[in-house]
Amino acid sequence: REETYKVIKQIVADAVQDGMSDADKVKALDAALSNSLFYDWDSYYLNSGQGDKADVDPMDVWKHRGYAAYELLNDNRVVCSGYAAIFKACADEAGVKSLYVTGTVPPQPGSNNNGHAWNLVNVDGTWKVVDVTWDDTDQGDNQSDGQYLMLDQKDPKLDGRVYDKDALLDSVVEDYVDPSRLAA
């Protein structure tokens, strides 16, 4: 845990400069994480019942976790929950109000699982969506394309995305999430 925190602090120190606005901090963190993290398709396949698509021995599933911030100490391969957990830790360290949220998204090509994790950030008093997973192009250039960065919760790109209300505190959920985006 302590080692992970050191890595988080270093990411923030390298990406965030004094005097940056919260929006600039979010952009810098998104770029830094897109530059250093890779989507762990093997973990995704092994943990979503598609082990036949994985390029590893299913008995090695323990090596392919990808779900938490401590993956920064391994090979920087994560799935959506890892991206979101790491972004949350970095945003907190940078002084940006953020939330880790889960829910469902429309089915994606090659996927039989529509569960997903992403973040909300408070920028200029408004809670915006940041999805580092979908913002990381993973096309070999390790760059963020910015398409899922600080989106309004009603942005058409987010149509079909539903928040898991059970994972948010009822007493504060209305402070963060557009009610039309909550699961019944």
Regions found by a protein language model. Give the residues of each.
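Hydrophobic/aromatic-rich core segments of domains that either
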Residues: 81-156
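Generic hydrophobic secondary-structure packing signal
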Residues: 25, 76, 113-115
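Secondary-structure boundary elements
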Residues: 1-72
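Residue-level recognition of well-ordered secondary-structure positions
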Residues: 30, 81, 92, 120, ...
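Hydrophobic (often cysteine-bearing) scaffold residues that line and stabilize catalytic clefts
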Residues: 4, 25, 79, 83, ...
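Low-complexity, Gly/Ser/Thr/Pro-rich intrinsically disordered linker/tail segments
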Residues: 141-184
